[in-house]
A protein has these predicted regions:
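Extreme N-terminal, non-catalytic leader segments
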Residues: 1-24
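N-terminal phosphate/diphosphate-binding loop that engages ATP/GTP or pyrophosphate donors
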Residues: 41-107
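Conserved lysine of the Walker
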Residues: 35
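P-loop (Walker A) phosphate-binding loop of NTP-binding proteins
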Residues: 30
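Hydrophobic positions on the alpha1 helix immediately C-terminal to the Walker A/P-loop
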Residues: 38
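Small-molecule kinase domains that catalyze NTP-dependent phosphoryl transfer to phosphate-bearing small molecules
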Residues: 90-91, 130-138, 147-150, 154, ...
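Hydrophobic anchor at the beta1->P-loop junction of P-loop NTPases
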Residues: 27
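ATP-dependent NMP and nucleoside kinases share a basic, alpha-helical "lid"
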Residues: 101-176
Length: 238
């Protein structure tokens, strides 16, 4: 299990010196595009660690709600991010020694996380934590919404996944239940918030591998990404 504490992370900016030494695959995309499932499968295929940065924003949201913090108070929420201790593995998440794996995927956190994710101070704290995690882990598959554009712009490979809102809603329903039309509306709202926020909005990097997963299996997508990584690494050794 990987301990991530925003109190003692290395404040090292991203750059070629770090990313060129490490195998980093950045996977970005909107909610429900298959990022988590594909990123986890890819990490297993490549035998490197996996980091879910979306879970980090959810953990901050949970902690802020727990403490009764006004989510519009940027300084207060950022202070929560700095103070909290988190333990993360591939499938379990702990905040201050409490297992929040299921809680952070619940409706309350899901409805509020886009507010927290739009706060620049919070994003700065978590970016530093993400860079430190990857440096300590020796690389990894990192998924989120600004990984290839901001956190690791010089990643080995940058991937942007998407799918139609209807398909993304169906996937969420199959995972967690709920009304498909209501979830599709939530997804569309989240897309708008993510793509229009002032700090690192969701967008495709110019040099990313774009994959529409609407009609593709997980295995097919993982195979395509792994093949691209192999091609890049092979050409770099020629």
């Amino acid at each position: 299990m990987q301990l991530v504490t925003t109190k003692d992370v290395l404040k090292e900016p991203p750059g070629r010196q770090m990313t060129n030494r490490l195998r980093i695959v950045a996977i970005d995309g909107p909610a429900g595009a298959g990022k988590s499932t594909i990123a986890q499968a890819l990490a297993l295929a490549l035998d490197i660690p996996y980091l879910d940065t979306g879970a980090m924003y959810r953990m901050v949201t949970y902690a802020a709600l727990r403490d009764g913090i006004d989510l519009q108070d940027e300084n207060a929420v950022a202070d929560v991010a700095r103070r909290m201790n988190t333990v993360m593995s591939a499938d379990r998440f702990f905040v201050d020694e409490v297992d929040v794996t299921d809680i952070i995927r619940g409706a309350q956190v899901t409805e509020a996380v886009s507010i927290v994710a739009a706060l620049s101070e919070v994003r700065n704290e978590l970016r530093a934590a993400q860079r430190a995690w990857v440096k300590n882990a020796g690389g990894g598959v990192v998924e989120g919404r600004d990984i290839g554009t901001v956190v690791f712009p010089d990643a080995t490979l940058k991937v942007f996944l998407t799918a139609s809102p209807a398909i993304r809603a169906q996937r969420r329903v199959s995972q967690s239940g709920g009304d498909v039309l209501a979830i599709e509306e939530q997804i569309r709202k989240r897309d708008h918030l993510d793509s229009t926020r002032a700090d690192s909005p969701l967008r495709e990097s110019k040099d990313s591998l774009f994959i529409d997963t609407t009609d593709l299996s997980i295995e097919k997508v993982v195979q395509q990404i792994a093949s691209s990584v192999a091609d890049i690494e092979s050409s770099s050794h020629e």
